[in-house]
């Protein structure tokens, strides 16, 4: 009798994606992050669902409803901190996944890469509107500052901001619609992730060498299912350690103060995973220029495949490109640190230099060094 998993219309899809999928035999642990992102998404949707059962999206009760979840709901504090720290784990996996793609040339799968960039933008939007929901000081002022950036758009800016706010300031209407967005976006992310996977399975996975691996494939199950389970255990262990020992390590103490439109916090800053982009935004003294730089810092990923000048796909055998890649990582860490610092000397100049270096590395230095490496191959 033929196996049902190969004939049943639904099972066949799952079988071709997770069981009998031909996979390169040499993909490293950097290829674990895709499945970890799927796990993060499932955890966020589940914890978020249980939080939504007790949360009220109203300016007068939002803050106290979060306090009620933490104090009165059975294991409410646990669900709340799993959700908050789950977002941090999500972004750690996301950045590792993108870094892997950059290092090993996975961006040459253009459809997969472009949907990935779209996924990144959607996840960032979800995290931003989600941060507003507890209605603490940083929630309110973060929402005010970031939505206000849209007023830099010529002619329609102010109208656009007031349209998003649903009034003349961040208020009840804003909170309600942000809750609606925060509820719907994860399902859009799930659909996009399925399309991301669909396009990936059209070409098959890349591998560390960047060389086609069609002649050496192994089935996804059991080899990579067991490898993914190991990665998942590490992820869950880290998340539980963070949630149970230091739940507020990555949060902002200002968010334990209820939102007050009459009192501005000393330092308005987003969650840690947006700090690099925030630093780039702040490093330009012009409002419109800053907004454009902020947008470009993320959208630059779309242009990566066009900037490929190397004859080799992966950086595995390109030491000079490797050096620039790790310089880029160090630069992003510097920007993340600067984004959390006050706007004063010497942080301003360091932020400006790091921002210039970020764009210079991606747009100029890496393509140039790739060309030099091509020449060196002929020696």
Curated annotation (Swiss-Prot):
Residues annotated to bind heme b b562: 83, 182
Major subcellular location class: mitochondrion
GO molecular function: metal ion binding; ubiquinol-cytochrome-c reductase activity
Signal peptide: none
Spans through the membrane: 33-53, 77-98, 113-133, 178-198, 226-246, 288-308, 320-340, 347-367
Superkingdom, natural source: Eukaryota
InterPro entries documented for this protein: Cyt_b/b6_C, Cyt_b/b6_C_sf, Cyt_b/b6_N, Cytb/b6-like_sf, Cytochrome_b, Cytochrome_b_C_euk/bac, Cytochrome_b_N_euk/bac, Di-haem_cyt_TM
Localization: Mitochondrion inner membrane
Keyword terms of this UniProt record: Electron transport, Heme, Iron, Membrane, Metal-binding, Mitochondrion, Mitochondrion inner membrane, Respiratory chain, Transmembrane, Transmembrane helix, Transport, Ubiquinone
Pfam families reported for this sequence: Cytochrom_B_C, Cytochrome_B
Binding note for cofactor: Binds 2 heme b groups non-covalently.
CC cofactor: heme b
Residues the entry annotates as binding a ubiquinone: 201
Example of a GO biological process term: mitochondrial electron transport, ubiquinol to cytochrome c
Binding positions (heme b b566): 97, 196
SUPFAM superfamilies to which the protein is assigned, alphabetical: a domain/subunit of cytochrome bc1 complex (Ubiquinol-cytochrome c reductase), Transmembrane di-heme cytochromes
Any one cellular-component term (Gene Ontology): respiratory chain complex III
Something else known: Heme 1 (or BL or b562) is low-potential and absorbs at about 562 nm, and heme 2 (or BH or b566) is high-potential and absorbs at about 566 nm.
Alphabetized PANTHER family for the sequence: CYTOCHROME B (PTHR19271:SF16)
General function of this protein: Component of the ubiquinol-cytochrome c reductase complex (complex III or cytochrome b-c1 complex) that is part of the mitochondrial respiratory chain. The b-c1 complex mediates electron transfer from ubiquinol to cytochrome c. Contributes to the generation of a proton gradient across the mitochondrial membrane that is then used for ATP synthesis.
Membership in a protein family: Belongs to the cytochrome b family.
Complex formation: The cytochrome bc1 complex contains 11 subunits: 3 respiratory subunits (MT-CYB, CYC1 and UQCRFS1), 2 core proteins (UQCRC1 and UQCRC2) and 6 low-molecular weight proteins (UQCRH/QCR6, UQCRB/QCR7, UQCRQ/QCR8, UQCR10/QCR9, UQCR11/QCR10 and a cleavage product of UQCRFS1). This cytochrome bc1 complex then forms a dimer.
The protein's name in its UniProt record: Cytochrome b
Organism encoding this protein: Sagmatias cruciger
Gene name in the database record: MT-CYB
